[in-house]
């Protein structure tokens, strides 16, 4: 059930399976109802979107779902990729505003540094729907649609506590995103009740596999020996797994992620990865499309929408679509 709140070099052979999965992942890689263009029924609506990065196929799936609905109505979707650069994202938003978009769908690179662009959108009378995260000032947006990110961290921590009597844990974070912070916070808050679980290292992976692998390698080179790794998302988890396997430590280390990516589910099925708290980019995209048109048509809509998450483990992974997203 969706929760809502009302509101208007050479690679060693042993590492190749994980990196192959990683390569697949990378390759896939306020209601302003009086806005002038909305009243012009004979002209297509223009919806702008900008996600923190299109290097994560999670956002490509969301965008595809939006595009299916928007283009089926004869409207226009303009998608931009800031590539994890907040200044670039702010500039993209300014450009979209100059292109006379009617509404902006946003996944911010930095939930705080996005505010100047949000203020410009508000001044232009363009409503903003935030997806898969939050912003520091929710008064500047019409609606926020996100998975239960804090709950995703809780699920991973509870599984660790139910399967290991104690653990030394490494965290792979993405501090500039509210969603990433909430996942790690939910995980840490849950472990905090038991002194047998300790955080012994942490690094910022920016949610990217190609960053997570060397960051995890650095920690291991420093002599850190984790029993578990909590990653804010599946690309980071896959990067951590590659580093752990390079050091011959993967078999003894529990690895957790968040997303439910096909590659992660495959690794869980093979016993290489422990679990992932699964999101549904398909559902997120569908809900976003519904909300976009509710706002533009002056209909009632929910200001906050929280989409539940579930934990995928080796025990239940076969009940999920192994080749696609939820």
Please name every model-derived segment:
Residues 103, 111-151, 162, 168, ...:
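Flexible loop/hinge segments that line or gate small-molecule binding clefts
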Residues 89, 144-169, 181-182, 209-213, ...:
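Hydrophobic alpha-helical segments within soluble ligand-binding/sensing domains
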Residues 77, 125-128, 199:
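Hydrophobic beta-strand scaffold residues
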Residues 103-121, 187, 198-201, 205-266:
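Hydrophobic alpha-helical
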Residues 46-73, 78-95, 99-101, 107-111, ...:
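Extracytoplasmic "Venus flytrap"
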Residues 20, 43, 190-192, 280-326:
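Hinge/cleft segment of the Venus flytrap/periplasmic-binding protein
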Residues 58-75, 152-156, 179-197, 211, ...:
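Short, solvent-exposed amphipathic alpha-helices that sit
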Residues 1-46, 116-126, 326:
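Short, low-complexity disordered leader/linker segments with a strong preference
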């Amino acid at each position: 059930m969706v929760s809502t709140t009302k509101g208007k070099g050479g690679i060693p052979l042993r590492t190749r399976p994980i990196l192959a999965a990683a390569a697949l992942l990378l390759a896939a890689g306020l209601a302003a109802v009086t806005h002038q263009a909305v009243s012009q029924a004979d002209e297509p609506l223009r919806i702008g979107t900008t996600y923190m990065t299109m290097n994560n196929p999670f956002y490509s799936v969301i965008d595809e779902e939006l595009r299916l609905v928007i283009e089926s109505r004869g409207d226009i979707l303009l998608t931009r990729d800031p590539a994890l650069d907040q200044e670039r994202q702010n500039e993209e938003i300014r450009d979209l505003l100059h292109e006379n978009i009617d509404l902006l769908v946003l996944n911010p690179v930095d939930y705080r540094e996005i505010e100047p662009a949000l203020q410009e959108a508000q001044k232009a009378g363009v409503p903003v729907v935030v997806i898969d995260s939050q912003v520091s000032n929710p008064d500047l947006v019409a609606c926020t649609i996100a998975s239960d990110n804090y709950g995703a961290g809780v699920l991973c921590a509870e599984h660790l506590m139910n399967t290991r009597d104690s653990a030394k844990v490494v965290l792979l974070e993405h501090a500039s995103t509210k969603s990433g912070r909430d996942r790690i916070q939910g995980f840490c808050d849950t472990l905090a009740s038991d002194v047998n679980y300790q955080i012994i290292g942490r690094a910022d992976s920016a949610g990217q596999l190609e960053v997570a692998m060397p960051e995890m390698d650095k920690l291991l080179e420093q002599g850190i020996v984790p029993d578990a790794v909590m990653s804010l998302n599946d690309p980071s988890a896959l990067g951590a797994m590659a580093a752990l396997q390079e050091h011959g430590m993967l078999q003894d280390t529990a690895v957790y992620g968040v997303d439910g990516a096909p590659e992660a589910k495959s690794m869980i099925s093979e016993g290489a990865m422990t679990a992932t708290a699964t999101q549904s980019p398909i559902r997120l995209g569908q809900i976003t499309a519904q909300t976009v048109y509710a706002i533009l048509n002056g209909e009632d809509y929910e200001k906050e929408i929280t989409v539940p998450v579930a934990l995928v483990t080796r025990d239940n992974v076969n009940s999920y679509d192994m080749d696609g997203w939820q």
